[in-house]
Swiss-Prot record:
The modification Phosphothreonine is found at residue 15. PSII is composed of 1 copy each of membrane proteins PsbA, PsbB, PsbC, PsbD, PsbE, PsbF, PsbH, PsbI, PsbJ, PsbK, PsbL, PsbM, PsbT, PsbX, PsbY, PsbZ, Psb30/Ycf12, at least 3 peripheral proteins of the oxygen-evolving complex and a large number of cofactors. It forms dimeric complexes. Belongs to the PsbB/PsbC family. PsbC subfamily. InterPro entries: PS_antenna-like, PS_II_antenna-like_sf, PSII_PsbC, PSII_PsbC_sf. GO terms for molecular function: chlorophyll binding; electron transporter, transferring electrons within the cyclic electron transport pathway of photosynthesis activity; metal ion binding. One of the components of the core complex of photosystem II (PSII). It binds chlorophyll and helps catalyze the primary light-induced photochemical processes of PSII. PSII is a light-driven water:plastoquinone oxidoreductase, using light energy to abstract electrons from H(2)O, generating O(2) and a proton gradient subsequently used for ATP formation. Keywords: Acetylation, Chlorophyll, Chloroplast, Chromophore, Manganese, Membrane, Metal-binding, Phosphoprotein, Photosynthesis, Photosystem II, Plastid, Thylakoid, Transmembrane, Transmembrane helix. One of its GO terms (cellular component) is chloroplast thylakoid membrane. The modification N-acetylthreonine is found at residue 15. This is Photosystem II CP43 reaction center protein.
Amino acid sequence: MKTLYSLRRFYPVETLFNGTLALAGRDQETTGFAWWAGNARLINLSGKLLGAHVAHAGLIVFWAGAMNLFEVAHFVPEKPMYEQGLILLPHLATLGWGVGPGGEVVDTFPYFVSGVLHLISSAVLGFGGIYHALLGPETLEESFPFFGYVWKDRNKMTTILGIHLILLGLGAFLLVFKALYFGGVYDTWAPGGGDVRRITNLTLSPSIIFGYLLKSPFGGEGWIVSVDDLEDIIGGHVWLGSICILGGIWHILTKPFAWARRAFVWSGEAYLSYSLGALSVFGFIACCFVWFNNTAYPSEFYGPTGPEASQAQAFTFLVRDQRLGANVGSAQGPTGLGKYLMRSPTGEIIFGGETMRFWDLRAPWLEPLRGPNGLDLSRLKKDIQPWQERRSAEYMTHAPLGSLNSVGGVATEINAVNYVSPRSWLATSHFVLGFFFFVGHLWHAGRARAAAAGFEKGIDRDFEPVLFMTPLN
C-alpha cells in the first residue's frame, strides 16, 4: 500500500535512480526516504530500528574486542604504554587490571580476557541485530507492547528515558564497586610513584562534589576537570549513579508536566537531536579531561600532560645544574627573572623560565617537593629521589605534541622521534567528534522544529530559478 503523499511531504525526498533497490516497507515509495538515508527509513518500524541499533552495538563491541586483542598482541611490557600508541590498554590499566607499583604491567592476561569477552559479546549482539533486521517482526507494538512505542507518546518516551538513566546509574556504580570491593583502581598519587589500591574513604560531602561544578572553568580553577584525588572521583560516581537511578525511577513513574510538553518537540528526529547535543557536550568534556587531568588519566599510562612535560623539563635541568654547582635559588635567567625558580602571581615559589605559565600543575612526582609556600628550596636541595628524576626525564621527552604523520615532539626538534601521545589522539578525536555531533545536533534540531511547525526549509523545486535559465551551451 502506498503512503499518502500528504503524509510524506514534510521530508525532502531525493529521487532513487535505481528502483530495484526497494525493500518492502523500507523503500522510498513507502517511507519517503531513499536507501542512503539509513535509519530514517525505519522511523515507524520499531522492530527493524531495534535491529539496526543492536547491530550497531555489535559493531562497536566488535571493534573494542578486536582492537583490545590487537593491542595485547603488539604490547611490549618493557616500554611505557604511551610509547606504543595504545588507547585501550591504558583504560584497563587505570581500572587496576594487570598493573603493579609505578604502573608497571605485571600481567597481560586480564587484557586478553577483556578482548575475548568483547568479541563473544559482539557475536551475540551481531546475531540479535541480524535477527531483528531481517527475521523479527517489523513493528513491536502488536506482539511486544512493552517494547513498542509511538514517537509522539510522551509518557512512553519518558519511561524509555528513565530506563536509560537507570542503566547509566548502574554503570557508574560498576566503577564504584570495582574501586571499593573488587581489587581497587590505579592511584597515581600512591606514595613512591603510584599503585593499585582500594578506595576506603569515599568523598560523599555534597559541598565538595558539587563544588567542582561551581568552579570557574579557567586557569587554576579548572571546573570538574581539576579533580585530583580518587576519593573525589569515586564519590562523584556514587552521587552521579544515585542521581541517575533516582531520576530514572522518577521518569518511569511520572508523566511530563505541561511546561515540558510545550517546551519540547516530541518526534523521533527531535530525540535524535537531543541525544547528539548531549553526546557533543560529553565529547568536549572528555577532551578537556584527557588533556589536562593526570588522576583520572594517569601519566604512567597516557603519557604526561602538556604542562607536566614542560614542568618536567624545568625540573630535569634544575637537578642537572644543581649537581654541577649552580645555586638554583638565586641564579638569574636572561630576562632578569629567576633562571630555575621564581615567584607566582600569588607568591608561591614556582619553576622559572618558559614553564612559568604552567605553574598550576600538580603531579605526583612533584608534590612531595612542595612546602607551604610552593616549591621548598631545602627539599629541592636534599630530598629529590631517583624515581622523581627518572620520571621527569621520561616525561620531558614525551610531551603530548605530535602531527598527523606521527612525528612527535616540538616542531623545531631535529631529533624528533616516532611518537604521538595517546593524550593527543584521545583529546583531538573527542574534540572533533564533539564538534561533528554538535553540527548534527543543530541539523536534526532544525529539521525536527521545521517538521513540527508544518514546513520544511528549502527551495521549492517547481519554481527553481535554474529551470528558467538558458542552457550554457
